[in-house]
């Protein structure tokens, strides 16, 4: 069966699902395979629960007499191809967002700004991979006026795969930094992979939103029509802005090309988030959002999922940024934490994963950053930091369980604490003891 024929059947359905636990009438089931499961084994159950069709790639489980079963060579590839056809069919303008750091926050801010004026489809959570992107695209409906699609990557070619599904008309790379080096091989590999978004835009008459102050992006975006934002005093920017204070929440000001200044008090922690806010405002203004609406949307945005959140426990003030960590974001978090006015500061930092051969070097650099800012109450969690700490005198813990044991025997009170590390370290498990 061709992709077009599958899509025609899909149009009689109410939606799609890849989760056998969420099957029901009206939903087309795509039987994806994972490391620990094979969706083909759940096809019969999905049909019994009312799914009108199930797309599968296991010939042994396929019943040619059952017209509800659709056999293909590869279910994931078919899901992506059907999503791409759906995107082409509707023709909704798509804004693609990627980057090493800040892409999810920027996506959420952009959605907040654009939603003041338009009916917007936006990636939910961090569904930004080879499965999440096509599922998001499949959610497009005729009433959507714009789509904001977040795209993540950990290996070369990942963004190329995702732009072929989402087919963005406009693109934003928040930044490029040292993350997933195990998969990318090098920082140059990061740049090439993230730059696959620019490559798509070049080949399809697209437009890029670019930070004028980011030298790497300025080199990467050559040959593209640009809409730019950045620090004040530069010619040709649609939006210019600057940090006013971080104590601990960011306040900044911005204006449109020489116009009146807007001052925005955010619920965001980290001066680096000003670039994310400026990007969202720039995108909004490009599509006709009113300036005050853009400011209000950014001011009212509340961060979620342990991304630069301030948590008051009654005993301590926690700056929780434990969703992910890489050398670029860790250095930025330390710089920002050094700017926060607090009497008694403490760090609980976890290993940065997926750095490959440069892992020890990058962890040593972070240890030097900690020393540079003069932090003394420092707890480091994981084997990479243990190997990099040297004679720093910082407290070392093999895992989060050891941290919790220490917190229970030595209660911590009255401190402002930065909690940051790769999500897999599990640092959020310490919060109940803080």
Predicted feature residues:
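Residue-level signal for inorganic ion chemistry
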Residues: 27, 46, 82, 97, ...
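Phosphate-binding loop of NTP-binding sites
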Residues: 4, 77-212, 216-225, 432-434
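ATP-dependent carboxylate/acyl-activation modules
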Residues: 97, 305-307, 424-429
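Active-site beta-alpha connecting loops in nucleotide-dependent enzymes
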Residues: 32-37, 303-306, 322-393
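Short amphipathic alpha-helix with an adjacent loop that forms part of the alpha/beta core around
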Residues: 164, 403-411
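Acidic, Mg2+-coordinating active-site environments of NTP-dependent enzymes
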Residues: 4, 60-65, 172-317, 342-343, ...
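N-terminal leader/targeting and accessory segments in enzymes
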Residues: 1-81, 85, 338-342, 368-369, ...
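Mobile, glycine- and charge-enriched loop segments
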Residues: 20-31, 120-121, 131, 135-147, ...
